[in-house]
């Protein structure tokens, strides 16, 4: 089924069935005649994968494996308690948001929403008529996903196109940000609803990670939209430069290290 334009990346077992007995996580050692498995398959386009491999090789490195971002982020941020639950993980990046549902620590659903933090920045730049770099600075320093979190007395000084100075009230900045963040959360929910069923029935908790999760109030906005417990996920169990590495923005990178470490060494 993955001939042509698609290449299989992951075949992740969810549960096994032995002679009709369901809900088996590990059938090794069991006696039976018929073994069935429910598998979550993840594929990607051969063209983008070829470009990725070429970029790694041109950097003088050897590519051992490819891991989807949603799986890597889950390996980094989910707690032992969450690995026993059904959790919706949203990795809000710059250009996209990776959506994943983990059941009992296993990836049961994955999708990509083609929106991320850069789209929020673009909205700010367009509506305030400021350069993209200035919009990113303002978003990171003063942005909030909910207007009620912004200081109503705070007026921000912004550098407009052509070098002119402008002003914007902090709550107005949040009102620019909120619609796009709502859209990202809505599309993520839609992908789960259409595949697994109603989110509030299927999921126990929501974990936000990625650079977009650093936007103040994103967890509160998600709690309002989903009606579920929400937390911001940081990489677990890291040491060394923890003030740098233990950030939602580095969840996928930490997860990739763990994914690579879990793979058998090649002879």
Range-by-range predicted roles:
Residues 44, 143-146, 200-225:
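Glycine-rich phosphate-binding loops at beta-strand->alpha-helix junctions
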Residues 56, 91, 124, 188, ...:
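Residue-level signature of catalytic and energy-coupling elements of molecular machines
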Residues 89-96, 102-105, 114-118, 209-213:
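A short acidic Gly-Thr/Ser loop motif
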Residues 122, 171, 175, 179-186, ...:
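Feature representing long, continuous alpha-helical segments
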